[in-house]
Amino acid sequence: MSWFQKLMPSRIRTDASERSRSVPEGLWTKCGHCSAVLYRPELERNQEVCPKCGDHMRIGARRRLAGFLDAEGQVEIGADVQPVDALRFRDSKKYRDRLAQAQKGTGERDALVAMQGRLRGMPVVAVAFEFSFMGGSMGSVVGERFVRAADTAREQRVPLVCFSASGGARMQEGLFSLMQMAKTSAALARLSEEGVPFVSVLTDPTMGGVSASLAMLGDLVVAEPGALIGFAGPRVIEQTVRETLPEGFQRAEFLLEHGAIDQIIDRREMADRLHRILAMLTHQPAAEAADAPEAGEQPSEATDPVGEHWD
C-alpha cells in the first residue's frame, strides 16, 4: 500500500478497491501501432481496426466472415474434415499435441473456415484463414476445405472470395502440405475455366506457400492496409542478400506501388467494395452501399489509384 493510500480513510480505500474489482478484464486494449488505449467493445464494432490510427489488427476467421457475409443463410463447407498425423511427426513437440493445443486455443479443427452464404444478397462462397491456428499454416485439411469451397463455387457458379492470413505450408505434414499448393491451384484453374470470379484478399500476414499459390491467383488481388505479403520474411531476405531492404518492403502499399496487387481496401469497406466489383463481374445489379466510414476514419481511396475504375 502506498503512503497516499494509507492517508485515505478506510471507507474510501474500500470503495476504490471494489470499483477496481468491478471492471471486467479485457475491457481495454492497446493499439500496437499508435499505443492508443482502446475500449474493446468499440474496437470490435470497428472490426478490429484502430479508430485512432486505422491500424488493421489481426482478426479471427469466423469473426471476419461474420462481418463480411450476410447474417442469414450461412452454411459451413468441409467442417467434417479433420487433421491426422499421418507422418507421426515430432520436432520439439509431437504434431498431434500441437494440433490439440491449437484446437483448444481457437475452437477450430484446423486453420481454414469455409462458408457458403450471401454478400449483400448476392450468393457467394467465402473462406478465411485462422492465423491463431498454427500460424494459419496450410496442411491437408486447409487444402481440402479450400478445394471443396472452390468446387462448390464452380458447381453453383457463384463467386469465391478468400481471405489469406498464413505463414505458409505446414512443415509438420511434409510433402502432404506442399502438395496443397498444386491442389488448390488446380481447383482455381478449373474455376477459371468456367468463368467464375475469384477474389483474393491478402491480410496480415500472407507468406510462404500460400502466397506462392492460391493467394496470388485471384482474378482480382486486393489487400488490407499495411499487410505483410511475400514468400520469405524480410529478416531472412536481408540475411541472405546482405543488403538493407527498402522501407515498407513487402507491405501492401509497396506491392500496390510496384503493380503486384490491384487494390488496397479498408476492412470496414471490404464487403461493400467487393459486392460492387462482383456485381459488375457477374452482370448483377449492386445493392445500395452501406453508410460511409465515420469522420476520422481512413477511406481506402487514399491508397487505391485504380478504385475509380472498379467503382
Swiss-Prot record:
Zn(2+) binds at residues 31, 34, 50, 53. It comes from Alkalilimnicola ehrlichii (strain ATCC BAA-1101 / DSM 17681 / MLHE-1). Belongs to the AccD/PCCB family. Residues 286-311 are annotated as: Disordered. Pfam families: Carboxyl_trans, Zn_ribbon_ACC. Component of the acetyl coenzyme A carboxylase (ACC) complex. Biotin carboxylase (BC) catalyzes the carboxylation of biotin on its carrier protein (BCCP) and then the CO(2) group is transferred by the transcarboxylase to acetyl-CoA to form malonyl-CoA. It catalyses: N(6)-carboxybiotinyl-L-lysyl-[protein] + acetyl-CoA = N(6)-biotinyl-L-lysyl-[protein] + malonyl-CoA. InterPro entries: AcCoA_carboxyl_beta (IPR034733), Acetyl_CoA_COase_Trfase_b_su (IPR000438), ClpP/crotonase-like_dom_sf (IPR029045), COA_CT_N (IPR011762), Znf-ACC (IPR041010). Residues 27-296 form the CoA carboxyltransferase N-terminal domain. The gene is accD. A zinc finger (C4-type) spans 31-53. Its EC number is 2.1.3.15. It is found in: Cytoplasm. Keywords: ATP-binding, Cytoplasm, Fatty acid biosynthesis, Fatty acid metabolism, Lipid biosynthesis, Lipid metabolism, Metal-binding, Nucleotide-binding, Transferase, Zinc, Zinc-finger. One of its GO terms (cellular component) is acetate CoA-transferase complex. This is Acetyl-coenzyme A carboxylase carboxyl transferase subunit beta. Residues 286-299 have a biased composition (Low complexity). NCBIfam families: accD. It comes from the Bacteria. Acetyl-CoA carboxylase is a heterohexamer composed of biotin carboxyl carrier protein (AccB), biotin carboxylase (AccC) and two subunits each of ACCase subunit alpha (AccA) and ACCase subunit beta (AccD). It is an enzyme of class 2 (transferase). PROSITE patterns: COA_CT_NTER. Pathway: Lipid metabolism; malonyl-CoA biosynthesis; malonyl-CoA from acetyl-CoA: step 1/1. GO terms for biological process: fatty acid biosynthetic process; malonyl-CoA biosynthetic process. Its main location: cytoplasm.
